[in-house]
Amino acid sequence: EVKLEESGGGLVQPGGSMKLSCVASGFTFSNYWMNWVRQSPEKGLEWVAEIRLKSHNYETHYAESVKGRFTISRDDSKSSVYLQMNILRAEDTGIYYCTTGFAYWGQGTLVTV
């Protein structure tokens, strides 16, 4: 059974920082690109960041709205992907999901700024 479990959300003041984590199981994590996406009533579903494989030198890509503020990383030995979020803004509020190229999804973690 494939599982993705996010954690680390909560309430943070504007300008603050927060780190999200996602632990995967049930598939070969190191073989999958990983993404963070978020959902809010105002913007709907919005892609946030992507990290590719070791063979791609863990190349990363970001939405323009978070570039320079958010950092995605992964630890294949722990089947985990992370999202470090700095200089948070009210518009970053939403439910954050990790996903494997949109095939598998976690349950999400709520971030409120």
Curated annotation (Swiss-Prot):
Keyword Disulfide bond: yes or no?
A: yes
Q: Which domain of life is it from?
A: Eukaryota
The record's GO molecular-function terms, alphabetically, read:
antigen binding
GO CC field:
extracellular region; immunoglobulin complex
Q: Which InterPro entries match?
A: Ig-like_dom, Ig-like_dom_sf, Ig-like_fold, Ig_sub, Ig_V-set, IgHV
Q: Which Gene3D superfamilies does UniProt cross-reference here?
A: Immunoglobulins
Q: Which UniProt keywords apply?
A: Adaptive immunity, Disulfide bond, Immunity, Immunoglobulin
GO BP terms, alphabetized = immunoglobulin mediated immune response
Domain Ig-like intervals: 1-113
Give all cystine bridges in this chain.
Answer: C22-C98
Q: Is the keyword Disulfide bond assigned to this protein?
A: yes
Which PANTHER family does the record cross-reference, listed alphabetically? IMMUNOGLOBULIN HEAVY CHAIN
Other observations noted: This chain was isolated from a myeloma protein that binds inulin.
Q: What is this protein called in UniProt?
A: Ig heavy chain V-III region T957
Organism for this UniProt entry: Mus musculus (Mouse)
